[in-house]
Amino acid sequence: MSKRVQVIGAHSADFVWRAGGAVAKAVAAGGEAEVIALSYGERGESGELWKQEGQTIENVKRLRHAEAEAAAGHLGASFRSLDLGDYPLQIDGDALLQIADAIRAFAPDVLITHTDTD
């Protein structure tokens, strides 16, 4: 039986080290996988990009999106970001609805995300 695996992470690169193996295994077994990032990590996880002269937040987001999309693609998953911002990443009522809608739309058999203390 193939599984639908959905990964929801705070930042665009979180899924690689948190769930990459599970995603690859599910896809190899004929399942589907979707990765959702709440944020691109444009402020807190993109230090090297900010060292480039003339860097902009829009460009950092574009680069982070391309990196995450490529990584997800290598694992056989789709990728999208809710682009909720970073530092601070605040989850308000609208953000919760976006997350709930994404879960309902994909209807995963397995949902992988952060622990409640992460």
Please place each PLM-identified region on the residue numbering.
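Active-site rim/loop-helix segments in enzyme catalytic domains that contact anionic ligands
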Residues: 1-106
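Acidic beta-strand-to-loop metal/phosphate-binding motif
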Residues: 110-118
